[in-house]
Amino acid sequence: MSDQDNTQTSSSKLAPHHNIFMANLESSPTKDRNTSSQNASSSRVIESLHDQIDMLTKTNLQLTTQSQNLLSKLELAQSKESKLLENLNLLKNENENLNSIFERKNKKLKELEKDYSELSNRYNEQKEKMDQLSKLAKNSSAIEQSCSEKLQNMEVNYNSLLESQNLYRDHYSDEISKLNEKIGLLELELSNQNLNYGSDTSSNSDIELNLNKFNDSVKDLKSLETEKDSKLSKIITHSLDELNLQSWLNLYQTNENLISTFAEKMDLKDVLKRNDEKISNKGAVVQTLKKNVQTQVESNNADALSSNNAQDMLPIKMVKLRKTPNTNDSSSNGNSSNNKRRSFYTASPLLSSGSIPKSASPVLPGVKRTASVRKPSSSSSKTNVTHNNDPSTSPTISVPPGVTRTVSSTHKKKRNSMVVHGAQS
């Protein structure tokens, strides 16, 4: 704005001086040069002055043109300055906008840095949790391995119990078959006696009573066997439910120690080698036992069904057959009475002939004889199964005398053979 004021003032100053100068040129004495011939000497001075004036006018014209050019240049510079000022204002506005955008970007950057720090903290926390979970996975794998070993020990004990149960079942089934044979022989004998000699009502009633007692004894044996099976099944299920007990591991270890000591005493080097191989190949034995668990449970159920079917045997009943004696034959009456007394008080000829099996004990028909069965209480059986480390105090069922030793020896043989086969597999 100051430059514009300067240009206006300079133009206003030049305008009147220019007009005066032009008027002086019009009234110049050079026009009267011919008329003023009076003073020739002074005319030269005047001419020289006029020449100087002409030079000055020329220089003045040049200066005016230069001033006009300068004024035009000044106007152009002023217009450029105004444009530059406008551009400067625009650039200032843009700078302010850019500063605001820059501040916003800085705020966003700070927020992103905060988010990054939070995410890094979360990542570190998740990494720590991942490490903890990996440690837990390793511990769980170790626990799983220990549980698999416990399962193996439980399977071995279950196999031993199953074998003992099968041995007892076979033994009692043999005894029942022998008793059934004996009952059939007695029926044949009594039927022959009734057909040949006839029988009195009193002797028939006594024989029926004896047979009823015998049937009761058979029923008692069956009930004891079923009770034994139920207790064994309860013990097995209870032991299978409690797989995480240390007592089964100790029991298995004591059994292995007993086998090794027995083999050392009997100088059985093959058994010792197989036992060592079994201990070294414990993982393979675990896998094979896991495969055999389901088949063993199914065989146990099948054995239970077969035992239930064997219990459906009907009791024996005495058929009353009477032969009318001949009243005329006195000798026949005497013989029949003697035979009645002999058949009631003494052994029958069929029994005295030695046709009875050797395993059956010679007992009178009226005498009731049952196998001695140990009936442990529920609390004692549970403590023996769960908290007793000694295998000798585990709940057992005794067999009749004379058969205990053979059953235990065969059980030991089968158990040793089972250990040997398990080591080989």
Swiss-Prot record:
Spell out the coiled coil positions from the record: 68-197
Which GO MF terms does the UniProt record name?
RNA binding
Q: Which UniProt keywords apply?
A: Coiled coil, Endoplasmic reticulum, Membrane, mRNA transport, Phosphoprotein, RNA-binding, Transport
Which processes are annotated in GO (biological process)? endoplasmic reticulum inheritance; mRNA transport
Task: Provide the primary localization.
Answer: endoplasmic reticulum
InterPro entries for the chain: She3 (IPR031398)
Query: Where in this protein does the record say Phosphoserine is found?
Result: 343, 394
Q: Which Pfam families match?
A: SHE3
Q: Where is this region: Disordered?
A: 24-45, 322-425
Highest taxon of source: Eukaryota
Q: Which GO terms describe its cellular component?
A: endoplasmic reticulum membrane
Topology term for the membrane: Peripheral membrane protein
Protein localization:
Endoplasmic reticulum membrane
Polar residues bias locations: 35-45, 345-358, 382-397
List compositional bias (Low complexity) regions by residue number.
326-338
Q: Report the sequence similarity comment from the record.
A: Belongs to the SHE3 family.
Protein name (database record): SWI5-dependent HO expression protein 3
Q: What is the lineage of its organism?
A: Eukaryota, Fungi, Dikarya, Ascomycota, Saccharomycotina
The record's gene field reads SHE3
